[in-house]
């Protein structure tokens, strides 16, 4: 399929992503990525937790995507195809429905940190930004309302190689995606939209 794309020089984003042969990424997942994120230049540089914001993409698939795009050899293949003139004809801005889901609470839950449930993630997000959370000593986490055992699990996770950097990189990526979201183009219509109302009495 990659050879066919290379020969035709023109393709869709979903077809291109599927052709890359990423583990666990079938046609439906490739279509979802294309629909929700819209641009190869964005997708190929996202850390894996961001992929969990796409409907029906769980941790295993998100990690497979992140692992694929983290490999310099895979990025080089993409670069070569683009340099040879392959063009993706249906790129677009990310789906605006992503906006409300791109927050620190969602990110902390998506990172699969031990003992950090969605409720605890929301609790942390109300007290810290990403950098402050990385810098927070255990007693500050407890003061923010976490049980000592949960705070200890978070500190242990942050101390593991690469995890703090992943959190900060993912928070930056959230901000980047939010900045690419299109402004709302339509105002929701009310139940009386288009109707004539006559008030009497």
Residue ranges, per PLM feature:
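DNA strand-break repair and replication-stress modules
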Residues: 1-201
